[in-house]
Amino acid sequence: MKFRKLLIIPAICGMVFVSCEKDNDTNNAEVADTNEVTTGSLETLGDNTDLTPTNLDQATLDLIASKHLSPIGAQEELRYLPDGTSEKAIRIEGDIVMTKAELEELEFNGYSNENAQYSTNALVSPQTITIIGYTGGSQALTSSEQTALQWAVANYNRLNLNINFSLTFGTNYQNKDMVVYNNTVNNPSGAGGSAGFPSGGNPHKFVQIYGLSNYNTNVIEHVITHEIGHSVGFRHTDYFSRQSCGQNTNEGTAGVGANHIPGTPTGYDSTSIMLACFSSGEDGEFNSNDITALNYLY
């Protein structure tokens, strides 16, 4: 799969929206996304749906397009939850996984045709976000994944934003704002993650990672940080080209706009944590543009 997932605000370094991330065994990386990545293999944060014929009806494809997301290769699939239950969902742009109802709730606020470093109005209200790392059954986070989640949360909290995270580990996820879990059992091929965009001032709840057992903790930290980014409203930094994945495809403005974030580049940012694809050489840290964007929005 080729997801890297992030939200309707193009890339932390530039946009907010939700999506997924995956690793591709090529010299280009994608997170639900980089031509300039030369270390290790490249992965996207989700399935390579852009290369797969869609299984959706025209009305649903039109709905996706109305949100300024790309309907190319969009797929209906089951989203498996940590307790083993599942629900119908739609995978868009490789690593954005949302139910049809969630998709319908996304608001359109206009958009820009500029390149990267943008934001939308789909943000999380100032709050403490309760986040749980799932530890039960076949979808439990491994020890390395738990450590990576701790590092990812620490990266966000040390910025002193008007959102912060309160992290616990366990199985009682129903009353938490966000749950991070290992869904490799239902994603046996590929490596990466997936998530969705915020709604109603709240973050997207479900953050999946999978196929990361052969990666070091820094790479896992990168994927988790990326997917959390989608969940609080960031879109892929290279949404306008998916260049990190070796592609030249515009993902669209994802319904909530694409407003340039002051102080960040308008072109390709090769080290942003919100690139669509990732490689085995990631360090899991925000770059300076990611931090600028986070501080501007939150």
Q: At which residue positions do the language-model features occur?
A:
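C-terminal motif of bacterial Sec signal peptides marking the signal peptidase cleavage site
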Residues: 16-19
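Surface-exposed patches in mature extracellular/periplasmic domains of secreted proteins
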Residues: 158-173, 236-243
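Active-site scaffold of zinc-dependent metalloenzymes
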Residues: 192-217, 273-276, 293-295
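Bacterial signal peptide processing site
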Residues: 21-24
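Catalytic zinc-binding patch centered on the HExxH motif and its immediate surroundings
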Residues: 145, 173-204
